[in-house]
Amino acid sequence: MANGWTGNILRVNLTTGNITLEDSSKFKSFVGGMGFGYKIMYDEVPPGTKPFDEANKLVFATGPLTGSGAPCSSRVNITSLSTFTKGNLVVDAHMGGFFAAQMKFAGYDVIIIEGKAKSPVWLKIKDDKVSLEKADFLWGKGTRATTEEICRLTSPETCVAAIGQAGENLVPLSGMLNSRNHSGGAGTGAIMGSKNLKAIAVEGTKGVNIADRQEMKRLNDYMMTELIGANNNHVVPSTPQSWAEYSDPKSRWTARKGLFWGAAEGGPIETGEIPPGNQNTVGFRTYKSVFDLGPAAEKYTVKMSGCHSCPIRCMTQMNIPRVKEFGVPSTGGNTCVANFVHTTIFPNGPKDFEDKDDGRVIGNLVGLNLFDDYGLWCNYGQLHRDFTYCYSKGVFKRVLPAEEYAEIRWDQLEAGDVNFIKDFYYRLAHRVGELSHLADGSYAIAERWNLGEEYWGYAKNKLWSPFGYPVHHANEASAQVGSIVNCMFNRDCMTHTHINFIGSGLPLKLQREVAKELFGSEDAYDETKNYTPINDAKIKYAKWSLLRVCLHNAVTLCNWVWPMTVSPLKSRNYRGDLALEAKFFKAITGEEMTQEKLDLAAERIFTLHRAYTVKLMQTKDMRNEHDLICSWVFDKDPQIPVFTEGTDKMDRDDMHASLTMFYKEMGWDPQLGCPTRETLQRLGLEDIAADLAAHNLLPA
């Protein structure tokens, strides 16, 4: 595996201190990333293992495209057991930044962390030199101080993935941070903390071997000039512009005349009109601080930044001097929910300081700096929605001890005072009092505080599954398509394949034409909140969405941008290129590849996930024990009939039929929703079939 892959697995046993090297080629049929992670976990972590057991593992895995220079390819897939959902099933975190590329440059496809150190350690990797170092002096520090200390000891070029106090204290909703603001959540911080592993620091100098450099350059140019859009691959601007046939105010292609990076070094820089075709200006298209926080963020925005080899630059960078008053750095930034979630807990909104809406901007920068430094994770905003529910419904008053309730400054909360966020996050990260259990996750607090059906069925709380995870582009995103997608994983689905297509900004007529070309019928694609009953084309759409996210998490590519379903070019009739992943794969690895072969590999990975979930749950009946949906999805908008304009609620019978059709499409048992022996064998998973059969977990 000389091109693309490194061929190496680094196994680190924290209990014994042994560090060994293994051959990754044995897992080649699983491609990399998510596929490697699932196969290793399936083989090595048996049912009954708990997240904080020494027997649990943490698998960091890259793919053949990682670090290659292919656009948007610096992702590492982190696989372990969930700390925060019912059953502690297998989950993934997906971390951007620079860690994945440095892993590859150092010579590793995979890092397996197993066992538990007797005292705090950090893992030091410099190419072939790997060692465990004492971390007592780092324990108790936040992610940023930890990163700075390790870089002083190693090199400014070292990429550090570190946990903060939340991970040390085994807070289930915790993660790790690399490159200051690129996070891997899903409880992985607590897994590291349970193993006394403070950080992994990696610096590589080897690079990634490319089979055909000329073709690689041609594909990069092709993608950058003809296919790529903005964040989430939105391909039209958010405002009417001289070059654009279409615009959509919801588009993340927000660059326009008169919109500036207001705090840029050397003076404001105008984003301007950015027509497609010029590779050098792609990074101006997306302006997430204004998109996420509103116009008040413009004057504080220094620039947009992002991950290694990503031209989109969706990570906003701001500088607000007055946030130092709250004991945090004046600079910081993030993207998406992490940018704006922190002030959502204020029932009356955040208090402004000088300008209209600056309280939201300032409060969120304070919040995200604290949150990231502690290494907390918001579960796609569910932590903050749970806080709002428990406060507004009187749960805190009922379950918190009187002394604890009295000492919390609820008056600051009502006033929108940012100091409340400081105290709130400190309590969560340091496990102070009963309130801190909020960061145990939704399932845990529902059990602990006896929240009942009112909690699970509350539409504003957005809990998708009674396993304790929220919606992530679900029924509001192509109805049955998003609903099926949200049922399939063991956390929020982290799938953007379908929502990127929906949100592309192109008019409905064009989107339906593309849907017909891809899925056989225009009826695969409905207008938002004007949905129709399930049909075969929608099932194909759902399968494609799931297989593409598995593919992206395996090769690895960023599913916030990929696939190239549509294009910003009128000359292409706005059509994208779904074979582009395969073209890059061939150029990088030198192996013949088609999109059909990659889709088959993705199906193998997805089915392995399903099989491992069956094994961990010790049940074949996935329909009735796993693929469950909270009641609000069906009961919202009681005054509007289902399948009429104005609602995105689902119909119970239709969803039952949808799952049956999807199971058949996947080759799973149509009633139980578990993989069959025939399908496992078709996908080259004979060993999995034999193992499930031995445990009576195959359908008759």
Swiss-Prot record:
Keyword list, A-Z: 4Fe-4S, Iron, Iron-sulfur, Metal-binding, Oxidoreductase
Cofactor: [4Fe-4S] cluster; Mo-molybdopterin; tungstopterin
Record-listed [4Fe-4S] cluster binding positions: 307, 310, 314, 558
Pfam families, alphabetized: AFOR_C, AFOR_N
Induction of its expression: Up-regulated by the oxygen-responsive transcription factor FNR under anaerobic conditions. Repressed in the presence of nitrate or nitrite via the two-component systems NarXL and NarPQ, respectively.
GO molecular function, one term: 4 iron, 4 sulfur cluster binding
EC numbers: 1.-.-.-
EC main group: oxidoreductase
Cofactor binding note: Binds 1 [4Fe-4S] cluster per subunit.
Protein family per UniProt: Belongs to the AOR/FOR family.
Protein name per the record: Uncharacterized oxidoreductase YdhV
